[in-house]
């Protein structure tokens, strides 16, 4: 703060009043339990505390006399200066409940706590030598290096009050000299800053700001930064990889928001978050899914991302490449493996379902289950296909979904149906003889053609029935296994 040789007369009066008001706080404060020791190191005892009461009373009386002298000086100079104490915010605050003494006391206490060590060192240096303005100025300037802003203004006031108490205890009367030290120092080194801030009346605003924002000057390393709500709807990519979890970041298109990543992960960009609802499904598959809906709700929601949507035209080709359970067995092997397997209702097996692959050259029948990941390949002889086509009233397009509670026919009913099929098979085989090359050709599991002798009569029907029984038994087992999963 630069030195100022001349200041306005009103500022001089206000500065003098500020110094007297702050020094007068000694008589209003309670004695502390511990006082600064004297230069000889003698501690004050209980008897000396009563002496301090007398000292404080004496200081109060002297300050009151100085204030009366200041009022008289202002009144006498009014005609020449035009300064009216009633218009000054220092002498007459706008708020009657607040006073300059109270504001200075609060600010001075804060400075005393923040600069405790530098102030104590400066006080000891001043008390160890004769009291002069030059010594006071040097010690004050060294102490203000540790302060900034209005705290620099409070440093000389705090030193003056402590010096007044100690020198009065020694029996001296330093009030007049210390008052002059304070006024001169403030006018020389602080006047420019105070005037730029708006004068001494700014002290009241400093007090009100600290009451409204108690932590405004404190530095807090745990500040909480609140993001504005304007851009709350926009989700920007996080800067740190630790913030984003792998299930949100893997295979996520840029156009998709983070809130939809759990059910759009690994989906094509063309498919929206609700595209799975628009894919056409088989009626029997819908029925099967509805029956298992309660059990599937308990599964992890993240499994929705594993659903693979396949067009209906791609199902036959995909089943051949990625079928989980596919069984292609000759009729003889099925008969040997399951000789006593119960047969389900044969009328439900129709000609269209037996020719599901729509490829007459290979004679492979695909039985579609409720799960698109499972397929069952069954091979039947030409005789069995011809026998099945003789019942046009039983033609259906889709094999009904197999239920675990399906009722099986008894042995008598099976024998009766076999006999009826034999009777129907005889005229059909006589009208349309099957070439030996077609009857003997079969598809092995590896896809190679192998010759097979054509069975005649009832043995063909028995072998075909056993094959159908085995096929349906395997299909039921696969369906139950998939539902348990």
Swiss-Prot record:
GO terms assigned for molecular function: cysteine-type endopeptidase activator activity involved in apoptotic process
InterPro entries, alphabetized: Bcl-2-like_sf, Bcl-2_BH1-3, Bcl2-like, BCL2L13
Region (Disordered): 218-248, 418-451
Transmembrane segments: 460-480
GO biological process: apoptotic process; canonical glycolysis; fat cell differentiation; mitochondrion organization; mitophagy; oxidative phosphorylation; regulation of apoptotic process
GO cellular component, one term: mitochondrion
Name of this chain's protein: Bcl-2-like protein 13
UniProt source species: Homo sapiens (Human)
Lineage: Eukaryota, Metazoa, Chordata, Craniata, Vertebrata
Gene that encodes it: BCL2L13
């Amino acid at each position: 703060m630069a030195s100022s040789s001349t200041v306005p007369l009103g500022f001089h009066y206000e500065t003098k009043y500020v110094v007297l008001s702050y020094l007068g706080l000694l008589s209003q404060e309670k004695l502390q339990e511990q006082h600064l020791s004297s230069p000889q190191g003698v501690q004050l005892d209980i008897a000396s505390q009563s002496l301090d009461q007398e000292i404080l009373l004496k200081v109060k009386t002297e300050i009151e006399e100085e204030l009366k002298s200041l009022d008289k000086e202002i009144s006498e100079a009014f005609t020449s200066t035009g300064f009216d104490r009633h218009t000054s915010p220092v002498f007459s605050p706008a708020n009657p409940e607040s006073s300059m003494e109270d504001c200075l006391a609060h600010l001075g206490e804060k400075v005393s706590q923040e600069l405790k060590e530098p102030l104590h060192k400066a006080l000891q240096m001043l008390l160890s030598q004769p009291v002069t303005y030059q010594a006071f100025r040097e010690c004050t300037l060294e102490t203000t290096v540790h302060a900034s802003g209005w705290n620099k203004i409070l440093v000389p006031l705090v030193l003056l009050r402590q010096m007044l108490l100690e020198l009065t205890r020694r029996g001296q009367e330093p009030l007049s000299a210390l008052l002059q030290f304070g006024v001169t120092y403030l006018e020389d080194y602080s006047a420019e800053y105070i005037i730029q801030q708006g004068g001494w009346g700014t002290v009241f605003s400093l007090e009100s700001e600290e009451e409204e924002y108690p932590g405004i000057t404190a530095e807090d390393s745990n500040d909480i930064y609140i993001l504005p709500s304007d851009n709350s709807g926009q989700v920007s990519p996080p800067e740190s990889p630790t913030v984003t979890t792998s299930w949100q970041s893997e295979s996520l298109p840029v156009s998709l928001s983070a809130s939809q990543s759990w059910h759009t992960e690994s989906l094509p960009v063309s498919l929206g978050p609700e595209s799975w609802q628009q894919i056409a499904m088989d009626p029997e598959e819908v029925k099967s899914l509805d029956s298992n809906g309660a059990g599937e709700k308990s599964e992890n929601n993240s499994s929705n991302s594993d659903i693979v949507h396949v067009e209906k035209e791609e199902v036959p080709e995909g089943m051949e490449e990625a079928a989980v359970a596919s069984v292609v067995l000759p009729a003889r092997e099925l008969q040997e493996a399951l000789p006593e397997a119960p047969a389900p209702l044969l009328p439900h097996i129709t000609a269209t379902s037996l020719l599901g692959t729509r490829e007459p050259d290979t004679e492979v029948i695909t039985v579609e289950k409720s799960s698109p990941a499972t397929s069952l390949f069954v091979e039947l002889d030409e005789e069995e296909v011809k026998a099945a086509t003789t019942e046009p009233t039983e033609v259906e397009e889709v094999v009904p979904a197999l239920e675990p509670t399906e009722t099986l026919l008894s042995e008598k009913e099976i024998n009766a149906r076999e006999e009826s099929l034999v009777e129907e098979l005889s005229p059909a085989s006589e009208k349309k003889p099957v070439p030996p090359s077609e009857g003997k050709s079969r598809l092995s599991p590896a896809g190679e053609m192998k010759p097979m002798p054509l069975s005649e009569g009832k043995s063909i029907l028995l072998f075909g029935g056993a094959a159908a029984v085995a096929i349906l038994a395997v299909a039921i087992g696969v369906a139950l296994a998939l539902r348990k999963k």
